[in-house]
């Protein structure tokens, strides 16, 4: 088993594709990505380093049945982590959003995961600068004007995705390896 676990929730399949691309680029140091609707709490807790990916739905929500998803996803999986101790774990987040059509909640669901893992004792790495994005609001921005993780816009900036992932992974490797 590798030391990095990649977990994602997806509604349209875009987050799954990005998770698979990240896995490919990590070249053997991460296990294959797991969809949270099929993952167990034990699998999640078995990794010292976690890469968590989510799209943002509706008004800045995690995917899940209550957000209108067809299947269980992050909303339901986070319930299984309510008492989990993530102390000693390192977490990095990536989120998908549409900064033009959902400008008022761009990648805001990343903040929900961020708050959850911080509250459970994890160390979060992989912040990303705000520059290069045009949106009106994101809950995923920290006070230092950086995102809590890597924001990706597959609708409007798909041509920047691979370069952003490469830069982000280089930063993560320095932080955790």
From Swiss-Prot:
Electron transport keyword on record: yes
Keywords: Electron transport, Flavoprotein, FMN, Nitrogen fixation, Plasmid, Transport
A single GO molecular function term of this UniProt record: FMN binding
Pfam families xrefs: Flavodoxin_1 (PF00258)
Record-linked PROSITE patterns: FLAVODOXIN, FLAVODOXIN_LIKE
Alphabetized SUPFAM superfamilies for the sequence: Flavoproteins (SSF52218)
Protein origin, superkingdom: Bacteria
GO biological process: nitrogen fixation
Positions of the Flavodoxin-like domain: 4-173
Keyword Flavoprotein: yes
UniProt cofactor(s): FMN
Its biological purpose: Low-potential electron donor to a number of redox enzymes. NifF is the electron donor to nitrogenase.
Family: Belongs to the flavodoxin family.
Protein name, entry field: Flavodoxin
Species whose genome carries this gene: Enterobacter agglomerans
